């Protein structure tokens, strides 16, 4: 399914988790079908965009009927690899890393942090939220043992690149980078940068220059 996903526009790919989360809620609520208009209201994406997004995957719904919730939930679960558990490692257990350890990823999907790494003697060897914290020196071995291909990076910026180089040697394929460093990786490795300061600055800019329309 991942090969199919790579053929769709990136903007569509980014919206798939939104659809999946709401469809999971509908399924758990016992709802059997949903229209694009209902989805639009819930996820705040216009219905024409939703229909176009869904069209990339073939005929998922019927005109006048809408979409079968159970069917498209199962379809998107496979597309997003949510039909199996994805093991993730957290690199860096500072303030942000600790907060992420306490976030229940398994509540709405099959993403699980299976190991965390740090150099602080007070943290190494401890267990937080049932997640063991190992010394950074053991990172490559533990990552391989747990079949981890995706990591969350929250180390200090000046340690980011050397840490990433080691992760690549351990066959990591995806990095969610919370550091301000712009890291270099081979083309087969995917990096998503999450810079909270930049996101806030962007939000403030849009608030000041493109105020939301009032009714």
From Swiss-Prot:
Gene3D superfamilies: NAD(P)-binding Rossmann-like Domain, Winged helix-like DNA-binding domain superfamily/Winged helix DNA-binding domain. Pfam families: CoA_binding, Put_DNA-bind_N. Its main location: cytoplasm. GO terms for molecular function: DNA binding; DNA-binding transcription factor activity. GO terms for biological process: negative regulation of DNA-templated transcription; response to redox state. InterPro entries: CoA-bd, NAD(P)-bd_dom_sf, Rex_DNA-bd_C_dom, Tscrpt_rep_Rex, WH-like_DNA-bd_sf, WH_DNA-bd_sf. Residues 18-57 bind DNA. Keywords: Cytoplasm, DNA-binding, NAD, Repressor, Transcription, Transcription regulation. It is found in: Cytoplasm. NAD(+) binds at residues 92-97. GO terms for cellular component: cytoplasm. Modulates transcription in response to changes in cellular NADH/NAD(+) redox state. Homodimer. Belongs to the transcriptional regulatory Rex family. This is Redox-sensing transcriptional repressor Rex. It comes from Listeria monocytogenes serovar 1/2a (strain ATCC BAA-679 / EGD-e).
């Amino acid at each position: 399914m991942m090969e199919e996903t790579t053929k769709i526009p990136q903007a569509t790919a980014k919206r798939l988790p939104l659809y999946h989360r709401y469809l999971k809620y509908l399924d758990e609520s016992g709802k059997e079908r949903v229209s694009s208009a209902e989805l639009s209201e819930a996820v705040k994406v216009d219905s024409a965009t939703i229909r176009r997004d869904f069209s990339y995957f073939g005929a998922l719904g019927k005109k006048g009927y809408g979409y079968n919730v159970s069917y498209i939930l199962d379809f998107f679960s496979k597309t997003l690899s949510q039909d199996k558990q994805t093991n993730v490692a957290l690199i860096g257990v500072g303030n942000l890393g600790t907060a992420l350890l306490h976030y229940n990823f398994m509540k709405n999907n099959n993403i699980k942090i299976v190991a965390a790494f740090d150099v602080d003697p007070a943290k190494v060897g401890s267990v937080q939220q049932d997640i063991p914290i190992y010394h950074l020196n053991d990172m490559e071995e533990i990552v391989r043992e747990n079949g981890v291909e995706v990591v969350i990076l929250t180390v200090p910026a000046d340690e980011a690149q050397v840490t990433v180089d080691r992760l690549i040697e351990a066959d990591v394929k995806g990095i969610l980078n919370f550091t301000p460093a712009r890291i270099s990786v081979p083309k087969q490795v995917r990096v998503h940068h999450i810079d909270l300061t930049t996101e806030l600055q962007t939000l403030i800019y849009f608030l000041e220059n493109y105020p939301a329309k009032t009714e």
